[in-house]
Amino acid sequence: MGRLLALVVGAALVSSACGGCVEVDSETEAVYGMTFKILCISCKRRSETNAETFTEWTFRQKGTEEFVKILRYENEVLQLEEDERFEGRVVWNGSRGTKDLQDLSIFITNVTYNHSGDYECHVYRLLFFENYEHNTSVVKKIHIEVVDKANRDMASIVSEIMMYVLIVVLTIWLVAEMIYCYKKIAAATETAAQENASEYLAITSESKENCTGVQVAE
């Protein structure tokens, strides 16, 4: 849960035109038959510098030795290589509407065991300065394991336990507050009743005295 929250926050920051950029590691465990996002984020050192970026993704299947290119994304065009393992399964999920890519993530739909292995996200960036241009390149490496069902990590378990503990504590606090308020209201009601009774007795006693005085005068 904690890691998922970090991914969400990182994606929100990267996708915001005016926001910052946070590099977040990708999840590494994909579930068979499900859609899986491989995260690749490469931030510029200086956000105010204009740049153009393109990426190439390569893949080495588990048990093999060579990397093969599976896609290239440049100028908002996704070019997929002919590879039956990824045919109709790869979807671009990175930056859109800009040549200055910082989020270069992809989706793999309907994951199979053939997608287990090592992925490389190659980031090629051309930086434009006032009097010159500068090329940079970065390689993000991600190892993916495909499993039958999701395994919960320790952070997720701890987060859920803390959530239930917080709910229990808040419930106890709420019950205690209700009991306190009830007792306070009951005490105030009892005090008011006693005061009313005292006033009633005083008035009754005064009335009797007045009646006695009238009878004596007669």
From Swiss-Prot:
Residues 1-18 form the signal peptide. Glycans are attached at N93, N110, N114, N135. Residues 19-157 are extracellular. InterPro entries: Ig-like_dom_sf (IPR036179), Ig-like_fold (IPR013783), Ig_V-set (IPR013106), Na_channel_b1/b3 (IPR027098). GO terms for biological process: axon guidance; cardiac conduction; cardiac muscle cell action potential involved in contraction; cardiac muscle contraction; cell adhesion; corticospinal neuron axon guidance; locomotion; membrane depolarization. GO terms for cellular component: extracellular region; intercalated disc; node of Ranvier; perikaryon; plasma membrane; T-tubule; voltage-gated sodium channel complex. Keywords: Atrial fibrillation, Brugada syndrome, Cell adhesion, Cell membrane, Cell projection, Disease variant, Disulfide bond, Epilepsy, Glycoprotein, Immunoglobulin domain, Ion transport, Membrane, Secreted, Signal, Sodium, Sodium transport, Transmembrane, Transmembrane helix, Transport. GO terms for molecular function: sodium channel inhibitor activity; sodium channel regulator activity; transmembrane transporter binding. It holds the Pfam family V-set. The chain crosses the membrane at residues 158-179. Changing E87Q: Found in a patient with non-specific cardiac conduction defects; likely pathogenic. The keyword Transport applies. Residues 180-218 are cytoplasmic. Belongs to the sodium channel auxiliary subunit SCN1B (TC 8.A.17) family. Regulatory subunit of multiple voltage-gated sodium (Nav) channels directly mediating the depolarization of excitable membranes. Navs, also called VGSCs (voltage-gated sodium channels) or VDSCs (voltage-dependent sodium channels), operate by switching between closed and open conformations depending on the voltage difference across the membrane. In the open conformation they allow Na(+) ions to selectively pass through the pore, along their electrochemical gradient. It is linked to Generalized epilepsy with febrile seizures plus 1: A rare autosomal dominant, familial condition with incomplete penetrance and large intrafamilial variability. Patients display febrile seizures persisting sometimes beyond the age of 6 years and/or a variety of afebrile seizure types. This disease combines febrile seizures, generalized seizures often precipitated by fever at age 6 years or more, and partial seizures, with a variable degree of severity. Brugada syndrome 5: A tachyarrhythmia characterized by right bundle branch block and ST segment elevation on an electrocardiogram (ECG). It can cause the ventricles to beat so fast that the blood is prevented from circulating efficiently in the body. When this situation occurs, the individual will faint and may die in a few minutes if the heart is not reset. This is Sodium channel regulatory subunit beta-1. It comes from Homo sapiens.
